[in-house]
Design a protein with these regions (language model features):
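Rieske [2Fe-2S] iron-sulfur-binding subdomain
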Residues: 3, 7-118, 152-224
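Glycine-rich active-site/cofactor-binding loop and its immediate structural neighborhood
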Residues: 98-147
Length: 224
């Protein structure tokens, strides 16, 4: 059953866990990003000036760029959260409900085919307490069910089942607590990519001249 939280005043709350409390998703790595009514303050994200760490004339690179945690987090925000990242291949999803789990940066991702045949990608994190809703590497399913408190999500990412529903606040609306979806998912020659940026340029435009090399390699086989 869903265990209520004990607040500082001794009262109990069964509120779902917010996106910010679960994981730093790619979309939330961007300064000022919002999910629902939440907004991560810009001040929490430290920017590092990296220009002085590289001397292009001498070809010298400060070794700190390989180990500094602040630079790594900045790369997650500025690069990985706004880039097209490879997720899977279309051949892995022949039937509705086929799924594959992978990563976008440090974010666990579920890639699946919905009942209309569309490839979708979701953050693999329950909106209640942040636990994984899919622990298998791949397979086929009708719903993704969190093993912590039993919340179940369908292939469209909608919250379709909540055990002990009467224990939740009256204002709790399951329609507001579906899985966080990767907003941009596109494919090229069977290769599926995702992007946390809903306004990102198209995958084809982003590939640019690299598409020629992909064509030369993938067109050798009619199946890609």
């Amino acid at each position: 059953t869903a265990r209520p939280l004990v607040k500082g005043d001794g009262t109990r709350s069964n509120r779902p866990m917010s996106s910010n409390e679960q994981v730093g998703t790619g979309v939330l790595r961007s300064p000022g990003a919002r999910v629902g009514g939440l907004r991560r303050p810009d001040g929490l994200l430290e920017n590092v000036e990296a220009c002085g760490l590289v001397d292009p004339q001498l070809g010298v690179v400060d070794r700190i760029i390989y180990t500094d945690e602040r630079l790594y987090q900045q790369e997650l925000r500025r690069i990985f959260a706004r880039s097209w990242l490879f997720l899977a291949h279309e051949d892995q999803f022949r039937n509705p409900g086929d799924f594959f789990t992978t990563w976008m940066g440090e974010d666990p991702i579920i890639v699946t085919k919905d009942r209309k045949g569309r490839i979708r990608a979701y953050l693999n994190s329950c909106r209640h307490r942040g636990a994984r809703v899919c622990r298998a590497d791949s397979g086929r399913t009708k719903n993704f069910t969190c093993t912590y408190h039993g919340w179940a999500f369908d292939l469209d990412g909608e919250l379709v089942s909540v055990p002990d529903r009467d224990n939740y606040p009256d204002h709790f609306d399951p329609r507001d607590w579906g899985l966080i979806e990767v907003p941009s998912v596109q494919s090229y020659k069977g290769l599926i990519f995702g992007n946390w940026d809903s306004e990102a340029e198209s995958l084809v435009d982003n590939l640019g001249d690299m598409a020629w090399y992909l064509d030369a390699f993938l067109d050798r086989d009619p199946d890609g």
